[in-house]
Amino acid sequence: MTKERVIIIGSGIAGCTAALRLMQDYDVTIITKGHKEQSNSMLAQGGVAAAISKSDTPKKHFSDTFQAGCFHNKVRAVNQLVTCGPIVIQKLINEGMTFDEKDGELSLGLEGAHQLPRILHSGGDQTGKFLTTFLQEKLTKVNWQEQKMAIEIIKHDGRAIGVHCLDKENQLHTYYGEHIILASGGLGQLFPVTTNAATISGDGLALAYRADATLSDMEFIQFHPTLLFLNGRCHGLISEAVRGEGATLIRADGSAIMETVHPLADLAPRDVVAATLFEEIERGNQVFLDITKVAHFEKRFPAITTSLDEHQVPFRETKRIPVHPGAHFLMGGVRTDLNGKTNIPHLYAIGEVANTGVHGANRLASNSLLETLVFGEKVAEYIHTQKNNRIIAPENPPTYQTTMPHLPEKHILQEKIWETLGITRKPEKITEFLHWLETFDYANHTRETAEISHMIITSKLIAESALKRTESLGAHRILKGVTK
């Protein structure tokens, strides 16, 4: 009997986890915009948060997650995240995944807004790379389709049945399946300053929107406080774990920035730290990480050390790393239930593209990799319960616009988005931005036009959500009022 087909859009940890749990019983295809190594998961320097120590409990992890999320989280989703977390971690360890140890015990790090150390790492600051590679090497029964950019989710009789893609020569490819899983990541490349991979430009969010899926909480975008900043440009993430190991944020004169701002000082929630640094920079101050108190920095952070050396940062002499906030993570996204189901039958969303409700208004550090693992498992478990979903693929050409479209240049769009929807927002600027967006067309006949069109759709969704939430909450800071 022919196996049912599962199409997964995205090659990060969420998609690979789902693929691993489905490939024995389903015909699984993973479609990825770039090469399979290109994902935010591969870049993740932090770790995986899980309540696995004797002094920790899921209840404590639940509390920290809710407080960081400004109590905008969904209770059942957070409960699933923190209770399943230790289980999925142990499952991975049993399958051969190795996490860093100290004195024969799992080494647990501390990060912002966690009340105690609970962060597992692998390869120091290379957890995302090690975990993604571990999963991908196990995907022996998966059909990989690399450098295929999804441009449209195909629907028939109200259900998702496939996806249209363009290869790097802009040739059309169509894939049909009984189950379509969006695992395409977030939207960092909407901004000129971001930690995200070059391929992450909100494609999955725009595809879902055009397929009539419900999206929510799009105003909640986390800006990471510390990107390496040199000569007016950012060059990747400096992990929060560096502050967890004792680094402090300082001005050029050496004065501490965070100690009078929040009780947790340098380990305050990311929205607080990012906004504080943004204000410092707006006042003309340079911002640095002082790593004087970080023991064995180069051993603990090998990937960051390599990056600093490549960019000729004299950190060994100065004990300083120049930093700047940048777009990092979307808390909102395609609304799903606890199994990753969207409102469109047979369309699922997992990982950063999804809004499961676990993060609320601001994500707790290292909960993102945990989310990918837990919900990757959950969507696979659910699909295993669904039988006899066979579809007959209809003739369904993509909805091309073949006339010459009117679209902005990518860098101009990025700058506009940063000015309007960055760390601090103003209603009048958002309204002006929405009017500007209305002057452009939609097109998907080439990868370039599709990407810019997806960026326009996604930024419009963010702007509309930001206008509706008239008071600040978590990562959404709008200059009309503040909700504590």
Swiss-Prot record:
Residue sites binding FAD per the record: 11-14, 33, 40-47, 203, 352, 368-369
Pathway entry: Cofactor biosynthesis; NAD(+) biosynthesis; iminoaspartate from L-aspartate (oxidase route): step 1/1
GO CC terms: cytoplasm
GO molecular function: L-aspartate oxidase activity; nucleotide binding; steroid dehydrogenase activity, acting on the CH-CH group of donors
Free-text remark on how the cofactor is bound: Binds 1 FAD per subunit.
Signal peptide: none
Subcellular location: Cytoplasm
Substrates-to-products reaction catalysed: L-aspartate + O2 = iminosuccinate + H2O2
Active-site residues, record numbering mapped to chain: 270
EC code: 1.4.3.16
GO terms under biological process: 'de novo' NAD biosynthetic process from L-aspartate
Keywords: Cytoplasm, FAD, Flavoprotein, Nucleotide-binding, Oxidoreductase, Pyridine nucleotide biosynthesis
Pfam families: FAD_binding_2
Annotated site, Important in orienting the L-aspartate substrate, chain positions: 111
Top-rank lineage group of the source organism: Bacteria
Gene3D superfamilies (alphabetical): FAD/NAD(P)-binding domain (3.50.50.60), Fumarate reductase/succinate dehydrogenase flavoprotein-like, C-terminal domain (1.20.58.100), Succinate dehydrogenase/fumarate reductase flavoprotein, catalytic domain (3.90.700.10)
Cofactor: FAD
Transmembrane segments: none
Job of this protein: Catalyzes the oxidation of L-aspartate to iminoaspartate, the first step in the de novo biosynthesis of NAD(+).
Protein family per UniProt: Belongs to the FAD-dependent oxidoreductase 2 family. NadB subfamily.
Name of the protein: L-aspartate oxidase
Gene name linked to the record: nadB
